[in-house]
């Protein structure tokens, strides 16, 4: 879902404002306007809004800013920060306290288990968990319900933990069948979260929303120190303004999810097993080595997990730009 450029409306907006002279580092009128749009959209009038180029950088900056040197972050073993960020969090000096989670989703019971392992944060010889990291959708394409998110928020309050939500694929989660979360719910139940754009039709960009006042001071200093202070920041504002206009961001996500679910439905009808029950724009299909070799001649997809000596789980991802006829060809 980051394999194409950007939606034509986004490119048109960039072209329209290309020769305008603005302040750098997201201090321009476009970013200020779009930040206000995000506050209104999320019903977080007092939130700080920052724009970051991509997900790994956003995760690293938020976690680095929130944690003291002896503190760590709880995540599922399949969590992006644990397996797909090349140790970015650890390189900043913070341990990822990973735990096995069904369908990639953390629960209050799992958080409590990690806290017990770490002596509820009372042993100075151990890392002190201080944050819970989740993503919606998860790495397995699964989504959280409102009740699940609220329950995680409550256990985080119980243990004085921050709850941080990676929203790189949040648009896809919001339009997925079975979702009961509204964009306004994340401001209620998360200390920080972001709305992904890179994987949903922007050239680049994640809109980070910080609701917890304790995380706000000097956050731009951390952005700069971690290499995230984008000089041509006005491009964030211009892109996201087009993104949110007339619900384009959700329309793009719906297209991606619709095409992906066509693949999921067809795979099951043809007798294939799904590795994970994902209602989003990611589909995980268990395939034989022979079928993988056959499909690789004409299609691009990714190995996701080993199943047995003869089968692997393969990940197929659709985007805002996936052509229905391409899905037809894969199904055939």
Predicted regions and their residues:
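Conserved N-terminal alpha-helix of the aminotransferase class I/II PLP-enzyme fold
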Residues: 7-54, 77-82, 88
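Conserved PLP-anchoring active-site segment centered on the Schiff-base-forming lysine
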Residues: 65-83, 112
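Conserved C-terminal alpha-helix-loop-beta "cap" of PLP-dependent enzymes
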Residues: 69-70, 261-331
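Hydrophobic beta-strand scaffold residues
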Residues: 73, 96-97, 163-165, 274, ...
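PLP-dependent aminotransferase-class I/II
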Residues: 93-139, 144-151
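Active-site C-terminal subdomain of aminotransferase-like
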Residues: 102, 128-130, 135-138, 143, ...
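Catalytic PLP-binding core of fold-type I/II PLP enzymes
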Residues: 144-176
